[in-house]
A protein has these predicted regions:
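A feature for loop-to-transmembrane-helix boundaries and adjacent hydrophobic helices
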Residues: 1-291
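Arg/Gly-rich low-complexity intrinsically disordered repeat tracts
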Residues: 293-304
């Protein structure tokens, strides 16, 4: 495709880097707009974003190095090389690093984790949709060979050199598949956000939708160097997606159990209060009837 958006002499503007910058700006803008609706301060989101972006980039690189450890163990000098710096990294590495940072950040700032993440995850979905367009332009995260009419053929030698994408072969445009998937998730989250019943619903919904979509899309990926587990049975991202789905199921079960216990406690409390009120009313009616009878007896009695 077009790994460089602009090339003037020795100056080259990478398409991936440009799309990443656009994704960051679009994500921050979206988070600020959504935050205002629920009372999250814009300055807080800007401060958080300036840190979490750096943390996510480092996390993505770290998981990339872990998944390709057999190569980096043999070539440790490449860990801090420019070639590694140019690589995009692994999404889940950046996401998990950002998640742990968020847990720490909200504790320090004393704000609700669920409320904060509900504001942020639509921006993550939108940012992923934009960034994957940069991946498509650079040739990374390419798909398996296909005979489908919408398959794409890469012909840029620079893309092949940087990402290893096969040239002259019709491939699944998995980058566009994921871009469309995350854009659809973004639309669902925007619709869901004002209709959620509990804080955290949007965050958990994003985790489930993305994990399911990513798990299926991994079967169409053709870049074999992205890392696998269990003797090539699952890719690293598929394994993490399964852990995420299991974690979400646990949270929903916990919420359901504790929600039922809370509802039961409220019901018992209401029943007790109702019984007390009913007993008090019955006592008042009994006293009233006793006073009325005493008054009638006094009126009917004759003086001696």
């Amino acid at each position: 495709m077009h790994p460089y958006l602009i090339s003037i002499g020795s100056f080259h503007l990478p398409t991936y880097g440009t799309m990443l910058a656009i994704a960051v700006l679009a994500g921050i803008y979206t988070a600020i707009r959504l935050g205002r609706r629920v009372g999250v301060d814009s300055a807080l989101i800007l401060d958080y974003s300036s840190w979490v972006i750096l943390v996510a980039l480092i996390g993505a690189k770290v998981l990339l190095i872990i998944t390709l450890w057999s190569y980096y163990r043999a070539h440790p000098e490449e860990i801090f090389s420019y070639a590694t710096l140019k690589l995009g990294g692994v999404f889940y590495g950046g996401f998990l690093a950002a998640l742990f940072f968020t847990i720490w950040y909200v504790r320090v700032r004393k704000i609700s984790f669920w409320k904060m993440t509900d504001v942020l995850v639509p921006s993550v979905a939108l940012g992923t949709a934009i960034t994957r367009l940069g991946c498509f332009s650079a040739g990374c995260d390419y798909g398996k060979p296909t005979t489908a009419p919408w398959g794409v053929i890469f012909s840029n030698a620079l893309a092949h050199e940087a990402t290893g994408v096969p040239l002259g072969v019709r491939l699944h445009p998995t980058q566009l598949y994921e871009s469309a998937t995350t854009l659809a998730i973004f639309a669902v989250l925007l619709w869901w956000s004002p209709r959620k019943k509990h804080d955290g619903d949007v965050f958990l919904g994003y985790l489930g939708l993305y994990a399911a979509g990513r798990f299926l899309l991994e079967y169409l990926r053709g870049d074999e160097n992205r890392g696998f587990v269990f003797h090539h049975l699952l890719s690293t991202s598929q394994f993490i997606a399964l852990l995420v789905l299991a974690g979400i199921s646990g949270v929903f079960i916990w919420r359901r159990v504790h929600g039922s216990e809370k509802a039961s406690a409220l019901s018992e409390g209401s029943s007790t209060e109702f019984s007390q009120v009913a007993g008090a009313n019955a006592g008042q009616r009994k006293n009233s009837r006793g006073n009325h009878k005493a008054k009638r007896k006094m009126q009917n009695s004759k003086p001696v």
